[in-house]
């Protein structure tokens, strides 16, 4: 089969393009190098829907950010992912910082952002009582918010799949060759896909994919951001996303009330050489906690329950690169999608669709499109009456597997049947393992459920695919944990 479009990379950009294309009469396949979608850049970021004031409208990233911001209510209604338009506060603690605050406010106004509000100290404390009382001023962007990025990607891909888009995970592209009619896309394991048009949405590896297809030469510079998750009961949780005055390299260390009720602080912004370097450090944690204490009241190091790091795919221009290739035919570049890429992603999907149309792809709207996913059932959101009804239909609904986040066996099974068969895939789909104990109580139970539902032996199950096995093997009838590396 020759597909009309092959999208390389199933993160927010590739998944958004797939969702757009799924509404047209064209055959599309989504190729992902990792074991599940969203396992690259998209799984580890701040989860913020930005407010359209950080970048000048002359940049592509600003234009798509502003457009994408306005698309989330409709998407959330259709695709059922956690999203909260809680608003953003940008705060200053000196008159010197207020100069930058005013510039950002004026830039937002120039960009066409509505309802921005300059605030004095009293108004800021009214909007967010947990702010440090020494705050001088700032502004409020009510159109900002938060989103759960991995659930967002899962929903986009599920929605696209229900409308005919195919998905191949564990498909690491090693070469692309055009024969005058179509692209032959080869994977590391020898599999081949044929497609008339290719979209390069490969995140950190977009530069490598571009070279493998003979397209433009550019370099992705990984910039690491460490994030720290606070206990759900932390006294430091604000009602709004809190931004400090930004630097040239970063929007600063933020305090983020996540869409699912936890609190996150970070990120850092450190250039690294290794595109797979997701290590975190105690020194960075202490520095971030110290910076956050200057912004909000109530945080202590004991609140931190885990850390993680993500890598931003940065181009020398610090802007997005989304365009048709000028070197090879029918090849669309979607590269350098760092912040505010998550916010811009719905608009990126539309932008890519329009580029493909310009590139010669015939796009005829389908007469029937499944636009709305069935609503998710989650016991932590059910009424007693609703839970009783679920239990009557399936006893697994009252078997709690993850106590910290209140996740039932039925929810785990649903995730598995939707293709999430790694521990991280289950975690990102259901939140099992994201609470205070970080999987200490539920991981063994989850492994047993995955094995039961898939038939895969427990010792072959992985945390995130590849060689990330959690168990070393069996001793008679006992599963043995691997020895720690020295």
Predicted regions and their residues:
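Glycine-rich FAD pyrophosphate-binding loop
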Residues: 23-44
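C-terminal catalytic lobe of FAD-dependent flavoproteins
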Residues: 250, 259-260, 271, 276-401, ...
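N-terminal Rossmann-like FAD-binding beta1-loop-alpha1 element of flavoenzymes
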Residues: 4-30
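Dinucleotide-binding Rossmann-like beta1-alpha1 core, especially the glycine-rich loop
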Residues: 47-127, 252-253
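Helical element adjacent to the flavin cofactor pocket in flavoenzyme catalytic cores
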Residues: 139-197
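Flavin-dependent oxidoreductases
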Residues: 16, 176-181, 186-266, 270-281, ...
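Short beta-strand to alpha-helix junction loop
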Residues: 56, 63-66, 91-100, 139-158, ...
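Iron-sulfur (Fe-S) cluster-binding segments and ferredoxin-like electron-carrier domains
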Residues: 408-419, 441-459
């Amino acid at each position: 089969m020759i597909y009309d479009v092959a999208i390389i990379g199933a993160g927010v950009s590739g998944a958004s393009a797939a969702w757009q294309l799924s509404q047209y009469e064209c055959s599309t396949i989504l190729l992902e190098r990792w074991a599940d979608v969203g396992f690259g850049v998209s799984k580890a970021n701040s989860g913020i829907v930005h407010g359209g004031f950080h970048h000048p409208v002359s940049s592509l990233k600003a234009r798509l950010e502003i457009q994408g911001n306005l698309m989330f209510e409709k998407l959330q209604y259709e695709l059922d992912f956690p999203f909260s338009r809680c608003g953003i506060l940008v705060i200053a603690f000196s008159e010197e910082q207020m100069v930058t605050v005013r510039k950002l406010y004026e830039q937002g106004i120039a960009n066409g952002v509505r309802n921005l509000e300059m605030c004095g100290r009293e108004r800021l404390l009214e909007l967010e009582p947990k702010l440090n009382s020494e705050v001088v001023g700032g502004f409020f962007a009510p159109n900002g918010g938060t989103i759960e990025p991995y659930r967002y990607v899962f929903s986009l891909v599920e929605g696209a799949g229900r409308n005919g888009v195919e998905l191949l995970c564990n498909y690491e592209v090693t070469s692309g060759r055009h024969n005058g009619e179509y692209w032959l896309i080869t994977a590391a394991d020898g599999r081949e896909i044929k497609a008339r048009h290719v979209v390069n949405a490969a995140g950190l590896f977009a530069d490598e994919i571009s070279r493998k297809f003979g397209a433009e030469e550019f370099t992705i510079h990984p910039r690491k951001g460490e994030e720290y998750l606070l206990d759900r009961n932390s006294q430091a949780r604000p009602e709004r996303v809190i931004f400090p005055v930004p630097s040239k390299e970063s929007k600063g260390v933020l305090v983020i009330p996540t869409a699912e009720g936890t609190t996150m602080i970070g990120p850092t912004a450190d250039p690294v050489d290794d595109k797979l370097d997701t290590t975190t450090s105690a020194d960075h944690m202490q520095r971030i906690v110290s910076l956050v204490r200057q912004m909000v009241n109530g945080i202590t190091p004991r609140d931190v329950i885990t850390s993680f790091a993500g890598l931003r795919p940065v181009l020398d221009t610090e802007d997005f690169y989304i365009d048709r290739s000028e070197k090879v035919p029918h090849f669309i570049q979607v590269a350098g999608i760092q912040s505010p890429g998550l916010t811009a992603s719905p608009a990126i999907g539309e932008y890519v669709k329009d580029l493909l149309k310009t590139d010669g792809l015939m796009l005829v709207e389908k007469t029937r499109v499944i636009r709305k996913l069935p609503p998710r059932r989650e016991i932590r959101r059910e009424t007693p009456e609703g839970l009783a009804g679920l239990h009557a239909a399936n006893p697994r609904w009252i078997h709690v597997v993850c106590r910290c986040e209140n996740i039932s066996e039925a929810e785990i099974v649903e995730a598995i049947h939707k293709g999430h068969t790694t521990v991280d895939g289950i975690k990102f789909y259901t939140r099992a393992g994201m609470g205070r104990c970080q999987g200490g109580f539920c991981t063994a139970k989850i492994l047993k459920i995955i094995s039961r539902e898939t038939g895969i032996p427990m010792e072959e199950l992985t945390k995130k695919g590849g060689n990330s096995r959690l168990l070393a093997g069996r001793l008679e009838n006992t599963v043995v944990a691997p020895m720690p590396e020295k």
